[in-house]
Design a protein with these regions (language model features):
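Extracellular glycoside hydrolase catalytic/binding regions
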Residues: 3-146, 151-166
């Protein structure tokens, strides 16, 4: 499927790149370690398929466990247009809280892109965006579909909402 997608978008200048798998392998999967070991070979196969039709666009590699665990990756020299992508919701909005991403990025000499941040307080967002900019990490503000929070779109829960979600 990725080869077909890449063939369709190969000449589109508005496409930043291809984010192969969003948040692969949840941390609660019983066979998480087994699946983690299969992710890098999958990335390589998909990258090769994309490169058959599109040599130009960036390919974003998401890590397992909500795009946060980069330990399974051992080889990143198979393409010259790869970029890591990570996600961050909550926690401290300061540099020490994302040092694992910064250190991994620096050890691989590849860019890191924070593909999702959001649904925190305005103060948290302001601090975290400054942290990302100082760390030279691009980011996407992703606060969609939230309840009772600052975001692009959200809802005020209807009366008895708690009863619905408790059901």
């Amino acid at each position: 499927i990725w080869k077909k997608i890449a063939d369709y978008y190969k000449n589109e200048p508005v496409i930043l790149g291809y984010d192969l798998i969003n948040e692969p392998i949840a941390p609660y999967f019983e066979n998480m370690d087994e699946l983690n070991a299969k992710l890098e070979p999958l990335h390589k196969r998909v990258t090769a398929a994309i490169r058959e039709v599109d040599p130009n666009h960036i390919i974003m590699l998401g890590a397992p466990q909500w795009n946060g665990n980069f330990k399974p990756f051992k080889d990143w020299n198979y393409d010259d247009k790869l970029m890591w992508t990570c996600h961050r919701y909550g926690g401290d909005p300061i540099r020490p809280a994302i040092m694992n991403f910064i250190e991994f990025r620096d050890s691989t000499d590849m860019p890191m892109y924070m593909g999702e941040i959001g649904h925190n307080t305005d103060e948290w967002q302001e601090t975290f965006c400054k942290t990302m900019e100082e760390a030279n990490i691009g980011y996407t503000f992703w606060p969609y579909k939230k309840i009772r929070n600052s975001c692009f779109s959200g809802i005020v829960p209807p009366e008895n909402w708690e009863k619905i979600i408790e059901f």
